[in-house]
Every structure is written in C-alpha cells, then in structure tokens.
Amino acid sequence: MDKTVAVKWMQDFDQKVETEKDHLSELDGPLGDGDHGANLARGMAAAIEAIKSTEPQSAAEVFKAVSMALISKVGGASGPLYGSAFMGMMKAEQAGQDLAGVLEAGLEMIKKRGHAQAGEKTMVDVWHPVVEAVKQGQLTNDVIDQAVLSTKEVAATKGRASYVGERSIGHIDPGSYSSGLLFKALLEAEE
C-alpha cells in the first residue's frame, strides 16, 4: 500500500471515530463499560499525532505508529485488539503482501489476541467477511454494513459482552461497528 493511502486511511478513520464516538459508546453501554467511543477517539487522536511526529516513510511505518499509539492510549480490550491488528498488518506490509494479505494478517492477530472466531459477536465478525470480500475484489459499503449488522442477532460468547449472554442479542457489537468505520475509511482512502 502506498504510504499516502495509508495516512489518508488513518485520517479518515480518525474522523469517523470522532464523529461517531458518542454512538460507539452508546452501543457499548449494554454490552461493556460504555466507553468504546471515547477510548477509541483518544487512541486515534494519539495515532494521528504519532504519524505526524514520526513522519513514516512507508505504509508499514504508518501501521506501526498506529499500533503503538492504540496499545498505549486505549484501555479495555479494543486497544490491544486494534493494536495487535495493526502490528500484524505492519509485518505483512513489510513482507510485501497485497491488501488482502495485510488485512488477513490483522484478522489473525485479532483472533490470536482475543481467542475469537467468527460468529461470537466480536470484531472478527466484520474483519473476516471484509478480508474475503477484498480477496474477491468485492468490498463495498453494503458488505461492511451487512457484516456489522450480523452481530445484532448473535449472543456474545467472547469478551466483556459475554457477561450479559443472551441479553446481548439485539445489540450491535461496538467493536464490530468501529471496525466497519475502519473499512469504510479504507474504501474512501482508496478512491
């Protein structure tokens, strides 16, 4: 990925998170601590500052700066999960992987860090179909929206949301929603 596309992607994601931070926290209320939006907004603001201060020379360096900022600034599960994803993406980018390979490396790191699989009402439920769509050259906003909405009718079995079990049905997973924002930002950055 070109460095300028990676930077634009992260800037677009930061803007989307900032715009939707209250909604993200509302989604997190019934399932978690109600702070996903505020935490992720703080982390992405730090990530953008890190990009500016480190002046990355490659997409891999952009992903590294984002990873380190999210791990250090975002509490709860989302910081380590997103941070791990971007670290995996950095390594795949350094290895010359294409976009599908880079995103798949991010997905694998999320699965490893969170011990999660598809169908458990986690970020994996968005990352997995997005990776498959990218492999087919068919990633669209509709694919992203369908993946996010798929988490609504599933009972959470992983993470903080699993504590409410069946009562999590009817609620969109906040990490899935923010992942949807990440991939919509990717589509915009690639235009």
Sequence positions of predicted segments:
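N-terminal loops that bind phosphate or other acidic moieties
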Residues: M1-E191
